């Protein structure tokens, strides 16, 4: 069934009790496009959204119109020429739980725990020159080690605790 709304958005897919239920495709006034599962008029289950204004794509699980459980988000910044990728757990539309966050072309890679969209808990941030391993809170390393790479495979270890190098 296809429904066209007054704002020119539309839904095409399965319906139950006059509500979007099952597989469906929708184009929204914002320009966003969604294809996937619906439950009682909500994006719920597995699906893919292409964001028009954020230059991004999310593919994964949804619950009540929010990213939830496991998924992959890729978005780009045309101003800074950066590509961001997150693969991992989501809760209430935020990166939350275990995941991997990559920024290219700089090759920043964070592998670890997230809370409410920020690095929080145990994790390792890898850069081209060094790595930061330890406990993170609200996106900042609180306690851990910094390993500085040299041109050879050897590296120097530096301990880090409460914003102090030791």
Where on the chain are the PLM-derived regions?
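Conserved anchor residues at repeat-unit boundaries in beta-strand-based tandem repeats, strongest
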Residues: 10-21, 33-44, 57-68, 84-97, ...
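Beta-turn initiation residues at beta-strand->coil junctions
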Residues: 3-6, 25-29, 48-53, 72-77, ...
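Surface-exposed loop/turn motifs in large extracellular/passenger domains
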Residues: 78-83
């Amino acid at each position: 069934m296809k429904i066209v709304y007054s704002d020119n958005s539309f839904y095409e897919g399965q319906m139950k009790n006059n509500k979007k239920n099952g597989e469906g495709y929708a184009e929204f006034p914002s320009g966003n496009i969604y294809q996937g599962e619906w439950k009682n008029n909500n994006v719920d289950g597995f699906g893919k959204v292409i964001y028009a204004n954020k230059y991004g794509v999310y593919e994964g699980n949804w619950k009540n119109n929010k990213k939830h459980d496991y998924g992959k988000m890729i978005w780009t910044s045309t101003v800074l020429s950066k590509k961001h990728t997150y693969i991992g757990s989501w809760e209430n539309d935020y990166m939350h739980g275990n995941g991997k966050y990559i920024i290219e072309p700089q090759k920043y890679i964070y592998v670890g725990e997230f809370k409410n969209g920020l690095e929080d808990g145990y994790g390792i941030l890898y850069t081209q020159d060094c790595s930061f391993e330890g406990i993170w809170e609200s996106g900042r390393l609180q306690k851990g080690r910094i390993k500085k790479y040299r041109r050879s495979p050897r590296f120097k270890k530096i301990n880090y605790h409460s914003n102090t190098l030791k």
